[in-house]
Structures are given as C-alpha cells and as structure tokens.
C-alpha cells in the first residue's frame, strides 16, 4: 500500500485535534478515578447529558453550545456533589465500594441513558453554530473548525484544571486526599468534603465535554458507551491522576485512532482504545507517567 | 440435601413448569420463558465469578455473544461445505452437519470457556475495578473483531432460519418448545453446579478470595487455580446460554449479541436476588426477567432497561445482600425478638 504523505499528515493532525477533545472527555475521570479512586463508569453518560442540554438550549434559543455548557457548570457540579454524597453514604462509609459501587455506577449509566432515550428517542441530534462547516487550510493541512474549536476549548479547560490542581489550596487538598486521606484528616481537613468538591468538579467537566462532543459529531444516547473504553484507556495509559500524562495519552490515542480509521477503516477504530487499555493494564498498569 | 436430590427436585420443578406451559398452550409462554431461563443461566454464571469470588465481570455480553457466534460460524460452515471440500469428503461432512443444538451448546461452552480461561489470566495483574474495566474492554475488542469478520455476517448480521418443528424419537416437536426444554435443562445444570460449588471446598476457596485475596494466598489457598476455574466455568456457562440464541432470534447482529443489556442484566439479577448463594441469581432473574417481559409487552423495551437500572441502584444502596439477605435478616429478627 502506498501511503500518500498528505493523507498521513492530515490523519495525524485530525488525530491530534481529536486527542485534544479526548483530553476534555477524560479530565473528569482522571479526577474521579485517578485521584479519588471512584470508578465512575457513568461518566460518559453525564457527558451525553451535557450534549443534550447544549442541544436543547441551542435549538430553542440559538445560543452557542459552549456558552451553554459553561452556564450549566454549577448545575453539573451540584449533580456531582449529590452523586458523591449518595455514593459515600451507601458504599464508602460501609466499605463496600468495590463490588457494589461499581454496580451502582453501572446502574446510573443505564438510568441516564434510557431516560434520555425515553425523552429524545434514538435519533441522532446535532447543534448549529457558525464554526460548524468551514475549515482552515494551511498548505497540505486541512483543519475543520468543527474539530479545531472543541480541541482549543478542551485544551483551555485542561490547562485551567491543571493550574487549579497544582496551584490553588483546594486543588492541592484534592491531590492530598488522593495520596493520603488519613494524613489529611490529621491536618484537620475533612476528606469527605474535599472529595465531594473534587467529584463535583469532575462531573462539571462533563458539561463542557458534552457540548464539545455534540459539536464534533451528532449524538444519540448510547454514543456514550463508546467513550467508556476510551476514557479509561486514556486515564490508565496516562498514569492514574496525572494530568500531563492524561493529555499525552489522549493525544496518542487520538492519533492512533485517526490513523487506524484512515488506513484500515473506521470499523476498527473502537478496538484501538480497548486494545490499548488491555495492553497497558497487562504490561504497564502504572501508565506512561505513573508513579 | 445432597446434589443428586437437589437436581432431582430441580428437574421436578422444571417438569412442573413444562406441564404448566403445556396446559397454557401458548407459544408466547415458551418465547418469554426461554428468555427468563437464559437469564437464569447468565446470572448464575456471572455469580460464580462475581458473587463467589468478588470479581466483577462487565463483559458477560461478550461471552454470551461468543457462544452465539460459534453457532453462527458452524451454521455458515455447513453452508460452505460443498465449496470448500472435495466431493469425496463433502458427503461425510454432510452426514455430521448441521450439528444438533446440544452439540452447538457444548461447542459454545468450550469457546467461551477458553475465553474465560484467558480472562482468568488477567486476574494475575488486575484486581478490583481494573479487572472490571478490562472485561469491558475485552467485550469491545471482541465485538470489533466480529463486526469485521465477514464470514459470520460482519456488521450486517446473519440470518438463521429456524425450522418449524424437529423430530425427536418419532415425535414431532415445535422448535421453540425444543429450545425451551434445552434451556431449561441448561438452567438446571447451571444451578446444580453453582450449588455444588457453594458447598464444596472450591466454594470456600472462592469465598477466601472474595474476602481477602492476599490473606488467602498467604494461607496457602491456590488462588490462581481457583480463579481460573471460576472464570472458565463462568465463561463457559455464558457461552452455553448464548449458543442456541441465533436459532431463537432468527437474525443475529453484533449490536444485539454484544448488547450491554446482557451485561447489566447479568449483574443486576444476582445483585437484586443476593450474591452469596445460588438462590439469589435464580430469584433475581425470575423476578426481573418476568418484570421485563411484562414491561416489554405492556410499555416498551426501553422502559424495561430503565427498570433494571433503577432496581439495581436501589438494591445496591438499600439492600446490599439482595432479597435473600433481606429475608434472612427478617427471619433472624423473628427468632430473637
């Protein structure tokens, strides 16, 4: 097979753009799973919820989906805090988080997804915005704005999160809770409160990620399932809880997936992320930048 | 009550169910009953690994689908005999093929059992939630392979025409009744196996893994061997449940065979019934299975998944030990007022 250079370059660029978006999708799980050790497999469902909220407001009032998602942040934060409170009281407190906690989130995934199906049906929905459609041409490279804008927003969000986690007091407290909960307690801080805040933030990222998702592709309720694997693959590959690692892993996965769908056909793309995940879990569970 | 007595009683119950079905004389009963029995097998299989050993398997659908697709592959193989083999071998193969469904069930069990063994080796490095995520990954990788495997229909799916009737020992039996009986037998075998495990040394070994794997290993429990037994058995039963499925449904496509519905059901049913004994998955799957059949007929099939989700979440929060746990607690309270 002759690989044409511009096809290759475009596939890599598209992969990097996609990877930036994947970073936004994974940011939440990186916090909840990576730092708090909460296996929130329902995270993609919350992302789809974000997509639908962006969709409704966009269709009814014509407001830009990204603005909608930023406005919706507090609501998602509150939802996350609530979910954590239920999770804490029912599982963490009783020390049953492993088996039943997993089942809890699995159930939550289905409830969210099926509720969306019951309300909106299984039709694909999409949003309208000025930047969906046109693209920028730089020599050989084609960059659709539909991909570029989500990627930039994702990177901005990711950067802010990284700054928050490493520079602010609260962010450092979240890092501390992920390292040693008991020590934090000895410093007279309430680990439960900090975890609640952190989980709230992790769900809040789903609002933005959801809006970006529906800009990139039409969405129907079960699309989220495809992201379960991607999100955990990136999170594990990046080294749990390491934000820079997550970003690198997201970009790698984006590029590999893009190359796979360009050269082997899109039907093989889902196997890439899960294959990655299986290989990482089997050979280097600590991830790229893991401790 | 020993194993023999138990299986005798289980077969007795099965016969009563059969008699009831014959008395109703409704074909629909067999269709609905088949689904419920299939869930009994799936839930029991899941519980062997999930309930007894404490390893959560999100990939039930993959094992189920592997069983189903092994049947499809054998069915397709039957159709290709004349083109693939020379004239002197073909008649010989035609005498064997098409294989009867019990053989297909066995075959599906072997295929999924081998996959289960492979999954068992994953437990060497992966514990807890990592294992659960890896099983989910396994399911998607397998689904992608099947989608890209044209021989079994790829993403277009495969049709299998179900015969109207089958002749066994001179009697002409409606095919759906035949499938129903096979699944009934399979359910009895699965339950008997689960119960036997529970009361054997194997079951105690499993329980030590569930409670504290490190301590178990330190005390000389051969944890790896036990885990491999559990994953293989669990996978094999799921495959066996899936093998007759193409004949039941008539048209199999990857999205329906690998549907997460099987994964969520095979987790929800034991969780709702109770994971510590064989009764739990049985109670859970009969209750939830019937409820879903009723919801599918009266409301819609989307609602029945919602019901499963809500019940699952409610039960893990309120009744961590399921219905069986609730009744046990109730009896304990009555005994000591």
Give the residues covered by each predicted segment:
Chain A
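Transmembrane helix-bundle core of multi-pass membrane transporters
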Residues: 90-91, 97-167, 193-197, 259, ...
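Hydrophobic alpha-helical segments embedded in the membrane of multi-pass proteins
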Residues: 24-28, 45-49, 207-208, 221-240, ...
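Single transmembrane alpha-helix segments in multi-pass membrane proteins
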Residues: 7-60, 88-96, 100, 239-243
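Inter-helical junctions in multi-pass inner-membrane proteins, predominant
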Residues: 2-14, 165, 169, 198-235, ...
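Helix-loop-helix "hairpin" substructures at the membrane interface of multi-pass membrane proteins
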Residues: 18, 142-219, 243-249
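Interhelical loop and adjacent transmembrane-helix boundary motif
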Residues: 6-10, 53, 57-60, 214, ...
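Cytosolic-side transmembrane-helix boundaries in multi-pass membrane proteins
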Residues: 119, 179-186, 190-193, 264-291
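Alpha-helical transmembrane segments within multi-pass membrane transporters and channels
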Residues: 62-108, 115, 248-253, 284-285
């Amino acid at each position: 097979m002759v690989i044409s250079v511009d096809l290759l370059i475009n596939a890599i660029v598209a992969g990097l753009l996609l990877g930036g978006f994947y970073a936004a999708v994974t940011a939440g799980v990186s916090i909840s799973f990576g730092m708090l050790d909460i296996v929130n497999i329902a995270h993609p469902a919350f992302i789809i919820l974000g997509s639908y909220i962006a969709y409704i407001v966009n269709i009814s009032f014509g407001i830009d989906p990204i603005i909608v998602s930023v406005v919706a942040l507090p609501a998602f934060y509150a939802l996350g805090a609530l979910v954590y409170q239920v999770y804490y009281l029912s599982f963490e407190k009783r020390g049953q988080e492993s088996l039943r906690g997993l089942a809890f989130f699995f159930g939550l995934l289905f409830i969210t997804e099926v509720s969306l199906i019951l309300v909106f049906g299984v039709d694909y929905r999409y949003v309208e915005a000025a930047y969906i459609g046109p693209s920028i041409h730089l020599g050989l490279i084609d960059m659709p704005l539909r991909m570029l804008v989500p990627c930039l927003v994702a990177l901005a969000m990711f950067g802010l999160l990284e700054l928050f986690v490493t520079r602010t007091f609260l962010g450092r407290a979240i890092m501390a809770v992920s390292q040693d909960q008991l020590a934090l307690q000895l410093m007279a801080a309430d680990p439960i409160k900090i975890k609640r805040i952190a989980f709230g933030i992790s769900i809040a990222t789903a609002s933005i990620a959801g809006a970006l998702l529906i800009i990139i592709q039409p969405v129907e309720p079960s699309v989220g399932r495809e992201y379960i694997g991607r999100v955990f693959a990136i999170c594990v590959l990046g080294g749990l809880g390491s934000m820079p690692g997550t970003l690198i892993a997201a970009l790698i996965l984006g590029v590999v997936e893009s190359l796979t769908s360009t050269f082997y056909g899109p039907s093989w793309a889902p196997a890439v992320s899960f294959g990655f995940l299986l290989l990482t879990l089997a050979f280097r569970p600590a991830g790229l930048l893991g401790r | 009550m020993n194993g023999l007595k138990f299986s005798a009683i289980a077969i007795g119950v099965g016969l009563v169910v059969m008699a009831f079905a014959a008395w109703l004389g409704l074909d629909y009963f067999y269709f609905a009953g088949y689904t419920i029995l299939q869930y009994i097998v799936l839930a029991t299989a899941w519980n062997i690994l999930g309930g007894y050993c404490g390893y959560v398997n999100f990939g039930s659908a993959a094992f189920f689908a592997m069983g189903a697709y092994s049947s499809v592959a054998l069915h397709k193989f039957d159709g290709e005999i004349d083109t693939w083999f020379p004239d002197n071998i073909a008649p010989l193969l035609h005498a064997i093929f098409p294989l009867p469904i019990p053989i297909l069930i066995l075959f599906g069990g072997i295929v999924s059992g081998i996959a289960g063994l492979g999954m068992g080796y994953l437990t060497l490095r992966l514990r807890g939630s990592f294992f659960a995520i890896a099983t989910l990954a396994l399911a998607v990788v397998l689904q992608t392979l099947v989608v890209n495997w044209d021989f079994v229909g790829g993403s277009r799916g495969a049709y299998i025409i179900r015969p109207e009737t089958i002749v066994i020992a001179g009697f002409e039996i409606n095919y759906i009744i035949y499938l129903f009986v096979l699944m009934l037998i399979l359910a009895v075998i699965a339950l008997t196996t689960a119960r036997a495990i529970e009361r054997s040394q194997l079951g105690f070994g499993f329980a030590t893994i569930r409670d504290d794997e490190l301590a178990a290993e330190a005390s000389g429990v051969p944890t790896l061997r036990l885990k491999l037994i559990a994953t293989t058995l669990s996978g094999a039963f799921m495959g066996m449940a899936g093998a007759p499925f193409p004949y039941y449904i008539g048209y199999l496509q990857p999205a329906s065979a690998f549907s997460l519905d099987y994964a969520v059901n095979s987790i929800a049913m034991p969780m709702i019934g109770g994971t510590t004994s064989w009764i739990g998955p049985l109670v859970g799957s009969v209750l939830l299975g019937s409820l879903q059949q009723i919801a599918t007929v009266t409301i819609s099939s989307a609602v029945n998944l919602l019901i499963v989700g809500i019940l699952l979440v409610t039960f893990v929060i309120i009744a961590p030990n399921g219905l069986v746990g609730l009744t046990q607690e109730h009896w304990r309270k009555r005994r000591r007022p």
